[in-house]
């Protein structure tokens, strides 16, 4: 789904930075002759192109890259504006920022806490934050729309359980590791995601559990 929305804005860069997803969803399609992957966690990083570091203090000179990808990264960063300013700093003028963030603060749960999130976003909130950092947003849309009813129901159930003390306390494994999905359910969810991909190839979607955004540095 990320690829459907954001790959058209990659172009043919020579210098590209992939922040926070050394072994993540962008490995197969976000590429360049000189690609650098940066992550706080050294696992999955392969020197010399894999660098351990923080988006709050990127170890690169100004205007080092033509494209920067940051998928499910900015929600981990506090202060948010420092992270976005750093992403802007290492991009050359006219460079492209591609990012994704989780949607809707009302969907906040122990999963967010355990994974080190500081916030969730609406589309307007994500657009405003990126524009303040000196970008012009060229596309911003929600994703995972077809599976959103199931996502919303699961988060509502978590909220009720937490409020009334049902289901016992959440341990780290409960909130970080996703529970196994039955093959039939997994097949249905993948089918719904394929519907999203087809729709996103033609238009933006009005709601979903993630926000996908492409922007150009002024």
Regions found by a protein language model. Give the residues of each.
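Conserved S-adenosyl-L-methionine
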Residues: 135-145
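A short glycine-rich, Lys/Arg-flanked "PGG" loop and its adjoining helix->strand segment in the class I
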Residues: 81-96
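A structural helix-start
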Residues: 77-81, 101
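A C-terminal cap/extension of S-adenosyl-L-methionine-dependent methyltransferases
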Residues: 147-218
